[in-house]
């Protein structure tokens, strides 16, 4: 993974974990968990692409990888909508900046996953 993307993930996760969003802290924890899961999935796709000769192994290890890919895109779309919603309702500038950066990162990661998945097909 690009070092800038890694630091962006780490920075956003750290800042989101410090936010206090009142009764929606459970939702925020869910978002953080999904961000972490998305990062791991993106890393595994990149690793499979980098070892393209190992594609057969990747497909055997994860026989339903196309189905999983579809689920990840659904998660990304949900996270994008959730981040946009949070961005609209928050008045705290720290939270606004964090959510804007999270939105940008999600869009970048979605594009990277699309690129990797096309290379694997």
UniProtKB/Swiss-Prot annotation:
Keyword Transport: yes
Motif Nuclear export signal: positions: 12-21, 85-94
Cytoplasm keyword on record: no
Subcellular localization: Virion; Host nucleus
InterPro entries the UniProt entry points to: Flu_NS2
Keywords (A to Z) from UniProt: Host nucleus, Host-virus interaction, Transport, Virion
SUPFAM superfamilies from the UniProt entry: Nonstructural protein ns2, Nep, M1-binding domain
Bilayer-spanning residue ranges: none
GO CC terms, sorted: host cell nucleus; virion component
Pfam family, one: Flu_NS2
Subunit structure and binding partners: Interacts with protein M1. May interact with host nucleoporin RAB/HRB and exportin XPO1/CRM1.
Physiological role: Mediates the nuclear export of encapsidated genomic RNAs (ribonucleoproteins, RNPs). Acts as an adapter between viral RNPs complexes and the nuclear export machinery of the cell. Possesses no intrinsic RNA-binding activity, but includes a C-terminal M1-binding domain. This domain is believed to allow recognition of RNPs bound to the protein M1.
Note: Average number present in a viral particle is estimated to be 130-200 molecules.
Family: Belongs to the influenza viruses NEP family.
HAMAP family registered for this protein in UniProt: INFV_NEP
Protein name per Swiss-Prot or TrEMBL: Nuclear export protein
Originating organism: Influenza A virus (strain A/Fort Warren/1/1950 H1N1)
Gene for this chain: NS
């Amino acid at each position: 993974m690009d070092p800038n993307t890694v630091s962006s993930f780490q920075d956003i996760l750290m800042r989101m974990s410090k936010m206090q969003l009142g009764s929606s802290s459970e939702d925020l924890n869910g978002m953080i968990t999904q961000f972490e899961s998305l990062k791991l999935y993106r890393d595994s796709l990149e690793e499979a692409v980098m070892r393209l000769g190992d594609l057969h192994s990747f497909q055997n290890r994860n026989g339903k990888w196309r189905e999983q890919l579809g689920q990840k895109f659904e998660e990304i779309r949900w996270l994008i909508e959730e981040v946009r919603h949070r961005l609209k309702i928050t008045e705290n500038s720290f939270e606004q900046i964090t959510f804007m950066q999270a939105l940008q990162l999600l869009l970048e990661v979605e594009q990277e996953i699309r690129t990797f998945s096309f290379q694997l097909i």
